[in-house]
Amino acid sequence: MMRKFLLRLMCWVLFQGLIWAAANAGERQPTGWDVFVHGQHAYVAGGENGLYAVDIRQPANLQRAASIKTAGQAKGVFAAGSFAYVADGSAGLQIVGIRNPADPVMVGSVDTPGDARGVYVFSDYALVADAQAGLQVISIRDPGRPRIVAAVDTPGEAHQVAVAANHAYVADGMGGLQIINIRRPTEPKMVASISALHDARSVHVIADHAFVADAAGGISAIDIRNPSRPQVVGALKTPGEAQGVYPLYNLLVVADGSRGLQLIDIRKPGSMRIVGAYHTPGETRSVFGLASRVYVAGSGFGLGVFDVIDRSRLNAKGHFLVDMDR
């Protein structure tokens, strides 16, 4: 008797699941993988939905200015000059013309051997964090014909990359933080690494320190005054899983997954402390700071904007653009 009841219950649950799946099959879930602010627009890497340009002149009334579908899954974005550079998953690097943000156009692309997740542009080069394929160095001198000119294999999966003083700092997942000399971009050389991390997802450099978002490990502060001999000088567990970091004034804003945004005082990197936390409608993935505002991208919403108050805290409630296609 009990066996029949359980069988009927399982069938009912399965049937309800099929109904829900059918009802939601055509929906495009709002997802922001990464965000970069350039001029009066925030450019949001929207996964399988491509790249979005959002007008941010009125944070209380965020408006999608345009979008463009990319060949893969847009996971990272960096904007410079008249172009947005998109780390497009299995489709490598996509270059989008944004001279007119309301009418973006595809300009060029180059496939990469891995899964492009993050991108950083400096001079005539784009550095792509290419997951299992490590760091790819791409010449963008001719945006219509980008080409790979060098690569460095890393021990983990490269998620994101930052550049400071002729060095690239790669958040390399289980491989920790990898430091690569790029004085000669076509001849990059590994110089050091910090492997004693949990799962490095993102990195940002400010002054003499690299701050690493280390997923369940929280935040690590690394002294990089001598890039060939980096040292962990501080660590702080966050309540969620740290995915993205961005320094602003004496603070570090952390995209902390299901726990929204965490605000960390980094005036003393060896004794960091959480000074604020802010709710978001979904899981945060990436954060960008500019002047008096913080921009956050995540799943369950596309883009959120918080105002900075007194250089020490954010307004309690941010403004969110949940429906990126409206």
Where do the model's predicted regions map?
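Bacterial N-terminal signal peptides that target proteins for export
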Residues: M2-M10
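Feature marking well-ordered beta-strand scaffolds used for ligand recognition
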Residues: L14-R326
